[in-house]
Amino acid sequence: MIELKNVHHHYPDGTRALKDINLNIPKGEFLLICGPNGSGKTTLIRLISGLLKPTAGSVHVNGLDPIHDSKEVRHLVGMVFQDPDSQIVGETVKEDVAFGPENLGLPLTEITERVDWALHVMGLKDLSEKACYLLSGGEKRRLSIAGVLAMRPQVILFDEPFSFLDYPGIQEVLRHMVHLHREGHTILVTTHDVEKVIAQVDRIAIIHGGELKLAGPPKELMMKLPQFGIRPPCYALLGKEKVSWLE
């Protein structure tokens, strides 16, 4: 479904962010993209979403180029940013979730249906008229996900989704991510803190210094994480079976 071939990316000041990335992500996969801060994780998913253009190489989603076929790819791919405040644009919860569908030019009846559905899925129905600035950190995170869901994407990109959240908030967001995966969505999540999500994912891709170092099942790569500045989950260090944060 997603193909990155010989992808390089340099920022305008000449800083190299990614070097020769080759990665195929099948439909329905739950992929963890991990690496230390500044490794290129966010740049990678921004290329997939079409927010950035590769300096060299190609990115395709269902055979479409996120830059040249931006309108079609916006229907396929949704991104949840690290800072939910940067993604919230409406005055109320309902208005914010409606923003995306409205900009697609959808009929009012379909906008209403999508908004109601997204609010229900994310447990925000009772907060639909609440001002966004009054929401807690966890509620803002759920709102940013609801706004993406209202666009009905097949692929959802989560950039450091557990930042700024307490333990109950992390569990809540993780529970929704797992549910979306079970519903058939392709899920990509970036983080330097693998402990919270590694028990749920199908595969890990390790990014270090802008390069894709390894990709494979969590069980195979778990104890190789420290080589790339990533702390393995506690259960792996203790020699135990995987433990989910949802248990």
Residue ranges and their predicted role:
Residues T191-H192:
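H-loop/switch region of ABC-family ATPase nucleotide-binding domains
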Residues G57-D65, V73:
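Conserved ABC transporter NBD signature motif
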Residues S49:
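Helix-to-loop junction immediately C-terminal to a conserved catalytic motif
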Residues T109-L127:
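Conserved ABC ATPase "signature" region
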